[in-house]
Amino acid sequence: MERAEFERMHAVEDRMWWYRGLRALTAQLLARALAGSPAAGPVLDAGCGTGGMLLKLGPAVAGRSTVGLEYDALAAALAATKAGRPVAAGSVNEMPLGSGTLGGYLSLDVLCHGGVEPARALKEAHRCLGPGAIAVFNLPAYDWLLSAHDRRVHNVRRFTGGQVRTLLAGHGFRVLRSSYWNTLLFPLMLLHRLVGRADAESDVRDYPRWLDALFSAALAIERAAIAIGIGLPFGGSLIVVAARDG
């Protein structure tokens, strides 16, 4: 990832609408899934970036401890400081963790990264999770939506729901829930991609307060729909809750 993009993320992820929406949706789905999981052990934020999610995980993990893993040493240090939690520097392709030690695993916009081998990362996640443990994956949707932010964070792939379900099933995971999100704003996203330049500025930035509030409200509506079991049929992102089989 470009260093400047890490710095942007660190600066705005506590207040930007997209990050707040992702954290709220992840916490909602994770809390519900963990409540029905037999697996104990800490919850790992694998590829935790600069720590925005790790900071907010506490209420969602049902008394479990939380830890982070981040490949970039600077981001790992920023995450540890921001979240006040242990953060190891390492790769999701080969995690420095014992087998069966985790009760939960978060992978938020990680399998899309050019430095990550999805099959290898999922094999490692399966190894480190206990039987029945919960994994939550968030991924950018649709290859044709690659953006300036994708390029700056070295994302090289985006996914469809079918691709993710097949990938997870092939590596020992049972999908419990899946939904696209960022659906109501999808027409704006599509328009932005169609008219934007390849060298456009990053999507990660502060937005005018009124616009941030409007976008946040759209995500809150989607979150309420997902909470009652409605799977959204398309969107800019895809979130999947799975359990480790075996």
Where are the model-predicted features located?
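Conserved N-terminal segment of class I S-adenosyl-L-methionine
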Residues: 1-98, 104-108, 120-122, 235-238
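Short, glycine-/aromatic-enriched active-site segment of Class I SAM-dependent methyltransferases
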Residues: 10, 135-157, 163-166, 192
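Feature marks short, surface-exposed loop/turn motifs that line or immediately flank catalytic pockets
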Residues: 75, 143-145, 184
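Short catalytic micro-motifs in class I SAM-dependent methyltransferases
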Residues: 109-113
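A short glycine-rich, Lys/Arg-flanked "PGG" loop and its adjoining helix->strand segment in the class I
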Residues: 119-134
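Conserved S-adenosyl-L-methionine
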Residues: 173-183
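A C-terminal cap/extension of S-adenosyl-L-methionine-dependent methyltransferases
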Residues: 185-246
